Each structure stands twice: as structure tokens, then as C-alpha cells.
Design a protein with these regions (language model features):
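DNA-contacting surface of Y-family translesion DNA polymerases
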Residues: 1-119, 195
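Acidic, metal-coordinating catalytic segment for phosphate/diphosphate chemistry
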Residues: 92-196
Length: 196
């Protein structure tokens, strides 16, 4: 069955769909921002997965900044060599656009859920529960706002340098060790996601 989309499809097919026509140039609100990649070689340990998650998180962070949104949570998708796909998600303590915070949450989810019975073939990172940065945020006890602001300044500086001098001019040292990602990584204007 198609669930609630089945009703919409049936109504459209039978000429009963009566929602108003959208204005030209209308863009529906963004619900999530994600990047994913099928690696050129299987990922066999946590260090290799961390480097891929960090690279993907930089792309997600860039897209969040372009759209002026904050991530309220992170979702990961993992496909192993048996082509089994699993997804997990978690809320962030404080909404962010920061690539390191997104990557750390994604890696935490990965370590909690993946048991290494088979190597990893593909990885997806998605920012979910998107928020407007102008909306007031509830501070949380135990959240290090000073560290958050420092990481935010670092992320913005890296982004400015990469925009001025070209992608990959400044990267985190961890990524220099190799990511097993294709040399042509999905660009920031293409969303890739796993289908259920």
C-alpha cells in the first residue's frame, strides 16, 4: 500500500484533487538536508567511517548555511556490503549548522547502532528537524556554549577560505588520511537519500 500518499495518488488519478495551484517560483519549505555517498572501497573500521561522516557533514553544514537553517537533529543511513540499509536518528542538545557537531552526533549514532558484522558500503548524513535561526532557542544545562561558538567561528572561516580559493583548500587533517570517497563527491546542490 502507499499509505497516505495512496489517497493523494488516487484523488489525482480520478480527477478529484482540488488543492490550489502554487505560484510560479514557489519552493516548498525544506524539511531535511542530507548528503550521502557510496564509497569506492568498503569501510572496515570506525576511523574510515568517521572521515566519511566528517566530509559529508561539511557538505550538509554548507547547505544549511545557504538555506539559513539550523539542524535540530541528525539522521544517518548505513548500507553494508550485503546491501542491508539501516537508519537511526537523534536530536541535538542545541540546534546547529556546525559540521563538527553534526559529524560527532552522526558518529555517536553509528557507534551505537552498527555492530561491524560486515563492512560498510554507503553512508548518508541528514540534518532533520530544521529550525529558523531567528527563533529563540532553549539553552540546556551541560551544553558548552563557548565551545559551540568557537567551532562555529572555525567552520565559518573554513567555509569562507574554501569559497574564495576553491573547494578543499582548507580541510580537517583527519580527512587528509583518505576517505574512500569518489573523487567527484556529490555537489552541494544535489540531495541524495536512501529509499525505505
Amino acid at each position: 500500500t502507499f499509505g497516505k500518499n495512496g489517497v493523494v495518488l488516487w484523488r489525482c488519478a480520478n480527477g478529484l484533487e482540488n488543492s490550489p495551484v502554487c505560484n510560479m517560483g514557489y519552493r516548498p519549505p525544506v524539511k531535511s538536508v542530507g548528503r550521502g555517498v557510496t564509497c569506492v572501497d568498503d569501510l572496515r573500521d570506525n576511523d574510515e567511517v568517521w572521515r566519511v561522516l566528517l566530509s559529508l557533514s561539511h557538505a550538509v553544514s554548507k547547505h544549511l548555511r545557504e538555506d539559513g537553517l539550523l539542524a535540530g537533529g541528525v539522521q544517518i543511513g548505513i548500507k553494508n556490503t550485503a546491501l542491508f540499509t539501516s537508519q537511526s536518528q537523534s536530536k541535538l542538545i542545541y540546534p546547529t549548522q556546525n559540521s563538527r557537531e553534526i559529524a560527532l552526533k552522526a558518529f555517536s549514532l553509528f557507534k551505537q547502532t552498527y555492530k561491524w558484522q560486515t563492512p560498510v558500503r554507503a553512508v548518508t548524513v541528514r540534518a532533520i528537524e530544521l529550525l529558523n535561526p531567528d527563533k529563540p532557542q532553549q539553552l540546556s544545562l551541560g551544553f558548552d556554549m563557548t565551545r559551540h561558538e568557537k567551532l562555529e567561528r572555525l567552520d565559518k572561516a573554513m567555509l569562507r577560505i574554501n569559497e574564495k580559493y576553491g573547494k578543499g583548500t582548507v580541510v580537517e587533517a583527519t580527512v587528509l588520511n583518505g576517505t574512500k570517497m569518489p573523487t567527484t563527491v556529490p555537489s552541494a546542490d544535489k540531495d541524495i537519500s536512501f529509499l525505505p
